[in-house]
Amino acid sequence: MSLSPASGTAGRTNWPAEILPVLEHTLTCEYASLTRTGAPITWPVAPYVAEDGRTVDVSTGLTYPSKAERARRDPRVALLYSDPTGSPVSGPPTVLVQGLATVRDADLQANTDLYLRRTLAKYPRSFARQPWFLVRRQVWYLARIWIEVTPLRVLWWPDGRLDVPPLRWEATPEVTAPPSDPVPAGAGAPKWLEPPADWRPRADHAAGLGDPVLTVVGEDGWPLPLRSSGATRVDDGFLVRIGPPGVLARGRACLTFHTHGADMSGQENVVLVGEATPLSDGVHVRVERALADFSLSGSRAGQVRKMVRTARALAPRLEREAARRGQPVPVPRRPR
């Protein structure tokens, strides 16, 4: 297939033109990174195309930096754009980007300014009902670490048809990513949220959140997140229906269920990890545990109460993480 140079926001690249609207307008993507032991972990995040059009970027909070620290240790990451909820793009392809991550946390104030600017542009209702003095109090959430992903390989399924082989694009051999900012000094804060003791109630609940994303590690060592066409709950996990190239998925696995409103007024996540084995009728995922997650669902009042509780838990970590990077705590500033 012959591809013409991309245009628009990502015009300085030769990414396939048909994927650009998806990269620019999809509200959430599934971001996959690798643990110290090489197991994949996948979470829904907000994606952005960089202003210079050379990377696709996601972020994580300074107070919960695990997504960034995994990428700093092993820059092989993947972004799957498979949920069109709230997107203005009609009949979008499902897009998988595999690339090298560059972690940016050497300028926390600039990171926070950029996050606010991008968030208000892409999600204008994010702070629409809040006076700015309340927004400023959310610095525990708004202080950001950026993860810039340089695409090396893109797979996409036109019209979201997951039952057919994907189209494929690869960067030229000289394309690489700049190094990440230095590892912060000292030890990071301990985990702030305990995972469920029993994964089964979370798995039962997840069955109502739509088709999950199954992530395994491909033969090339890259995380491979793929949207399934359905999952059936079984005693020890799930039987997942998956199209090519996931039919032979095996090894360490992550199942990510998530949903969000068209206006991003709420979101809910369930992430389960275990072991995948290919079968004749799908991929069997034996679940070992559920990960601790932060979801915002239910009434607006309930969401506010949860944010207040979370702020109390995470605020003490803010100064510690900023100090590890030799910087003051950033100040949320209204974009001009």
Task: Annotate each predicted stretch with a short phrase.
Residues E24-T26, W140-R144, T150-P151, A207-D211, ...:
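Short gly/pro-enriched beta-turn/loop segments at secondary-structure junctions
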Residues R12-E24:
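Mobile-element integrase/transposase regions
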Residues I19-L20, A68, A203:
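Short amphipathic alpha-helical segments and helix-helix/interface helices
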Residues H25, D74-V77, G208-L209, V247-H258:
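Short coil-to-beta transition motif at edge beta-strands of beta-rich domains
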Residues S2-T13, S90-P201, R241-R336:
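Charged, gly/pro-rich active-site loop segments
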Residues T26-T63, E69, A78-D83, V89-P93, ...:
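Short beta-strand segments
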Residues V22-L23, A71, T119, A206:
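A generic structural signal for nonpolar/aromatic side chains embedded in well-ordered alpha-helices
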Residues P182-P223, R227-S228:
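Surface-exposed interaction/gating patches
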